[in-house]
Amino acid sequence: MAKNSKYSDKQVDAVLHDMIAVLEKHQAPVELSLIVLGNMVTNLLASSVGTHQQAALAQAFSDALMNSVKK
């Protein structure tokens, strides 16, 4: 999703592979997968980001997601 990142493609791909494997293990359809991933993002924001930064980071994430699906 991000074009510029401090993380290597190898790091991102490894985590992505593991997350896809979990969703496949549970035979999660697209809707359930999106619900789980959305809840994960919400949990990360709530547990790891200061309250005053949560909305801005959520908006930046949303914008990046929208940009990644635009054609």
Curated annotation (Swiss-Prot):
Residue stretches spanning the membrane: none
Top-level taxon of origin: Bacteria
Pfam name, any one: DUF1414
Origin organism lineage: Bacteria, Pseudomonadati, Pseudomonadota, Gammaproteobacteria, Pasteurellales
Family: Belongs to the UPF0352 family.
Name this protein carries in UniProt: UPF0352 protein Asuc_0778
